């Protein structure tokens, strides 16, 4: 079974996806972290001038995904963690993810991971493009000011004023919604939830009754 959770940054996708996967004992795949891994690798001096086709054909990054552990990202042999949370990597990932070659490459990987077992996929085009036939599709929204507050908690203290971050989020929304390749849209048949004033437990209470028990 595949459950997709889409939506813009700061709406609570990651927290919800982890909680839902844990509750259902499903695998969890953060596809945003996958794009940020590619962006991080591409930003390294040795790879900035390499043609994109060659970069993807012999990537310096890799992913580990199994029934026993969530998605892990590596650059060479080094496990990537906090490196993927920097604003520089996030901004470049937004630009890099517009490349059709990059999206096709990533979608192939994501579909391979779906064969491992029941999984919750979190991203921006999971239900609309990668898994349009997913059994359950969720789309999260939230007020810009709430999203900015949530994102600030993930960034080093003093990184950005709230107003500047909110402006970045709105600009990212527009870029994601207007890009030609797999734009951010509400998937057909998706459950749309505004998470602004809801806790993760409250969102789970809305979602769990909608998941057919025979599919889990």
From Swiss-Prot:
Pfam families linked: Cytidylate_kin
Binding residue positions for ATP: 7-15
Family matches, as SUPFAM superfamilies: P-loop containing nucleoside triphosphate hydrolases (SSF52540)
Annotated S-S bridges: none
GO terms of biological process kind: pyrimidine nucleotide metabolic process
GO MF entry, a single one: CMP kinase activity
Keywords: ATP-binding, Cytoplasm, Kinase, Nucleotide-binding, Transferase
Gene from which the chain derives: cmk
Lineage top rank: taxon: Bacteria
EC number: 2.7.4.25
GO cellular component, as recorded: cytoplasm
Record has Transferase as a keyword: yes
Family, similarity comment: Belongs to the cytidylate kinase family. Type 1 subfamily.
Catalyzed reactions: CMP + ATP = CDP + ADP; dCMP + ATP = dCDP + ADP
Subcellular location: Cytoplasm
Primary location recorded for the protein, binned into one broad class: cytoplasm
Protein name: Cytidylate kinase
């Amino acid at each position: 079974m595949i459950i997709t959770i889409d939506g813009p940054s700061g709406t609570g996708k990651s927290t919800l996806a982890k909680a839902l996967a844990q509750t259902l004992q499903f695998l969890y795949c953060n596809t945003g972290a996958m794009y940020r891994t590619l962006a991080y690798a591409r930003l390294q001096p040795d790879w900035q001038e390499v043609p994109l086709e060659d970069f993807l054909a012999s990537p310096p990054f890799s992913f580990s995904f199994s029934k026993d552990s969530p998605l892990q990202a590596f650059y060479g042999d080094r496990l990537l963690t906090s490196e993927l949370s920097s604003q520089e990597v996030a901004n470049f990932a937004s630009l890099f993810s517009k490349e059709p070659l990059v999206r096709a490459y990533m979608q192939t990987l994501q579909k391979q991971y779906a064969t491992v077992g029941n999984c919750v996929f979190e991203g921006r085009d999971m239900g609309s493009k990668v898994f349009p036939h997913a059994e359950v599709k969720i789309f999260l929204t939230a007020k810009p000011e709430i999203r900015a507050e949530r994102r600030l908690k993930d960034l080093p203290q003093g990184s950005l004023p709230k107003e500047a971050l909110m402006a970045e989020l709105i600009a990212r929304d527009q870029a994601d919604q207007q890009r030609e390749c797999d734009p951010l849209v509400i998937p057909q048949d998706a459950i749309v939830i505004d998470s602004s004033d809801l806790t993760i437990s409250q969102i789970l209470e809305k979602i769990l009754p909608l998941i057919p028990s025979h599919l889990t």
